[in-house]
Amino acid sequence: MSRTSDGNTAELWVPTGSATVRVPGKVNLYLAVGDRRDDGYHELTTVFHAVSLVDEVTVRNADLLSLEVVGEGADKLPTDKRNLAWQAAELMAEHVGRAPDVSIFIDKSIPVAGGMAGGSADAAAVLVAMNSLWELNLPRRDLRMLAAQLGSDVPFALHGGTALGTGRGEELATVLSRNTFHWVLAFARSGLSTPAVFTELDRLRDVGSPPRLAEPGPVLAALAAGDPEQLAPLLGNEMQAAAVSLDPALRRALRAGVEAGALAGIVSGSGPTCAFLCRTAESALDVSAQLSGAGVCRTVRIATGPVPGARVVPTPGTPE
C-alpha cells in the first residue's frame, strides 16, 4: 500500500490481480427507426437478443492506462482513447475518483463494425471488470448509468438476454424468451459505419418509401412462445435497406442463407453481419456448412441465444 505526503492511504489502495469478463454480441430481431431528430439521433424501437458469440476482456492494475486487442478484426481497431473500452475505463475511474491505471486486454470474437455491438460489448465488459477488480461493489443501476453515457448499445451488453429497447436503444425492458434459438452468423468481407447507414436510411426516406415495420407485439409473443417458426417471418430491420444499398453483396448472402435451409435471414443492426435463424442445432450446422462454401461472406459462426450479459469469469477455486 502507498502513502501520500499527508498520510492518507485509502484512496491509493487497490487490490492486486485481474478480472476477466465475458460479454456477448447482439442481434436485433426487430429494429424500427424513427425519423431523424433535431439532435441528430433517431428514436429506436428494437428487440435486442444476446447471442453466444463473446469477447473476453481482462483488466489488470497497472502504472498507466493501456489497451491491447487480439482476435477477430483486431487490426482494424484503435488501441487508444478512440476505443470505447478505453473511454469506459476513464469514465469508471472518474466516477469513483481514481486514476484509470489499468491494462485492458481484449480477445475478440464479435466482428468489428458488424452490427453486433462488439465495441459496446467491450466497453460494458470494462465497467464490470473494473467494478470487480477494484472491489467497488457499485450497484447495477450505477453501471447502467455509466453504460448509457458511453453509447446506446452499451446498456444492453450489461443486460443480456432479450430486451425491448427504446429511446436511442438505451432504455431497456426485459423480454420473456422461452427456449434456445439457433443462429448462423455470416460476417461480411468489410464493415459498415453505423452513422453512414443512418445517413443512407435518411436519404432513402427522402427519395422514396423504404419498408416500415408494424409494432413489435407479435415478435414478443413469438419469443414468449419459444417458437422459431413463429418468430422467423416476424424478423425485421428498417436499416436493412440502407445496409444493402451500401453493400449490395448482402442481398446475395441473405438469399444464400435461406436457400441453405435457414428459416429467415436478417441484417443485424446497421450491418453488415447477417443473422440466420434455424430450426435446430443440426439445421444450424447444415446452414453453416453450405454458407461457408457459397462464397458470399468472409466467415461463418454458429451461435445460440439468449445468453447473459457481461459477467465476471470466476477464477479457479471461487464460487460462481
Curated annotation (Swiss-Prot):
Q: List UniProt keywords, sorted A-Z.
A: ATP-binding, Isoprene biosynthesis, Kinase, Nucleotide-binding, Transferase
Q: Which residues form the active site?
A: 26, 153
Give the GO biological process terms: isopentenyl diphosphate biosynthetic process, methylerythritol 4-phosphate pathway; terpenoid biosynthetic process
State whether keyword Phosphoprotein applies: no
Domain of life of the native organism: Bacteria
**Residue ranges of the TM segments:** none
**Substrates-to-products reaction catalysed:** 4-CDP-2-C-methyl-D-erythritol + ATP = 4-CDP-2-C-methyl-D-erythritol 2-phosphate + ADP + H(+)
Pathway where this protein functions: Isoprenoid biosynthesis; isopentenyl diphosphate biosynthesis via DXP pathway; isopentenyl diphosphate from 1-deoxy-D-xylulose 5-phosphate: step 3/6
Q: Which residues bind ATP?
A: 111-121
| E.C. numbers | 2.7.1.148
- Gene Ontology molecular function: any one: 4-(cytidine 5'-diphospho)-2-C-methyl-D-erythritol kinase activity
* Assigned protein family: Belongs to the GHMP kinase family. IspE subfamily.
Q: Which PANTHER family match?
A: 4-DIPHOSPHOCYTIDYL-2-C-METHYL-D-ERYTHRITOL KINASE, CHLOROPLASTIC
Q: Name the HAMAP family for this protein.
A: IspE
What does this gene product do?
Answer: Catalyzes the phosphorylation of the position 2 hydroxy group of 4-diphosphocytidyl-2C-methyl-D-erythritol.
The protein here is known as 4-diphosphocytidyl-2-C-methyl-D-erythritol kinase
Q: Which organism is it from?
A: Mycobacterium ulcerans (strain Agy99)
